[in-house]
Amino acid sequence: MRTSPRMKWFVLLFTFVFAIGMNSFRNSFQFFMLPMADAFHADRSLISVSVSIFMITTGIVQFFVGFFIDRFSVRKIMALGAVCISASFLVLPYSPNVHVFSAIYGVLGGIGYSCAVGVTTQYFISCWFDTHKGLALAILTNANSAGLLLLSPIWAAAPYHAGWQSTYTILGIVMAAVLLPLLVFGMKHPPHAQAETVKKSYDWRGFWNVMKQSRLIHILYFGVFTCGFTMGIIDAHLVPILKDAHVSHVNGMMAAFGAFIIIGGLLAGWLSDLLGSRSVMLSILFFIRLLSLICLLIPILGIHHSDLWYFGFILLFGLSYTGVIPLTAASISESYQTGLIGSLLGINFFIHQVAGALSVYAGGLFFDMTHGYLLIVAVCIVFVGLSAVIELVPFLDKQKAKETHHSI
């Protein structure tokens, strides 16, 4: 079946809008966190459990979604995800307590999110684009950030004007009445299906050799753990951090954060190609993230109180936010045999999500213990500093190997 050359760009636009809607499920949480905690008479560590469960669920489910795509229609999997997200939004307001809320948000919402976006949308767009594939995927990746940029003012105002329960109900209706039809009628099936099938045998020996002996994979996985740990705490606790510090224009800060995430994500891929080294770019990203955390640490320690420190954090953390995952994935795909890449990427995503889940809960727990975020920020600084250094090791190894080769 032949389609208009313009059709793929319309499909990308519809998928972009679809992804913004699905990402609203997790992006809106931090804006509703404090009102929800008050409604359930829960502290921050307890309400944060829902996000931890969500991140663990998505980490596990995304590992298997790629295999399901090869057996079932990707659009059916995305539709299942959209139904689960819509159902979660509609049921959550009727949760009798925080434990039921956490189970619904974390498990049902996590399954829905994993099926609706991520591996599925990337696969879907890859099937549509034979050319301009890199640009298309880069645009799609920024749907989450665009949603944060565009919708932050709504998320900030909604729980205090309409209430979080009514807001969730409205979102559930929008998912079912707008985004599901958009998927069915706008996001058409790709003109040609992927011919590849799941391998019947798996190279377990090669897999375990890589896991046990490859220093590169250990370094990349540590970096991904650091990325997930620092992103998790910021995704769930940034708005409470800013409000506790009485920062003015929190809504504007969050919108700017989304803009910096988009800019940083696009720049990271371009610069890594320009530098010719994923490792160097990863190190640079972690160094930028280290500077951002230092900006956050200064007002927390009481050294100097100014909104500019928080803006500096928003700027630098935003620029380093999305680059680590795609560059790590690129490094894995360029360094290991094809038959192992899917599993290695699945573990990569799982580590990222588990690290995020740990930090979300730890951030709430440390706050309840110390009434501040100093301890969790200090832990993040240690992880990021280590990652900024060790990500350079593969680059230095290559330079050393080149020098040895030339000397011979």
Curated annotation (Swiss-Prot):
Q: Could you tell me the superkingdom of the organism this chain comes from?
A: Bacteria
User: What is a single cellular component term in the Gene Ontology annotation?
Assistant: plasma membrane
Q: Does the keyword Glycosyltransferase apply?
A: no
> Where does it reside?
Cell membrane
- Keywords from the named record: Cell membrane, Membrane, Transmembrane, Transmembrane helix, Transport
Its predominant location is: membrane
What protein name is recorded for this chain? Uncharacterized MFS-type transporter YcxA
Q: Which organism is it from?
A: Bacillus subtilis (strain 168)
Q: What is the lineage of its organism?
A: Bacteria, Bacillati, Bacillota, Bacilli, Bacillales
Gene from which this protein is expressed: ycxA
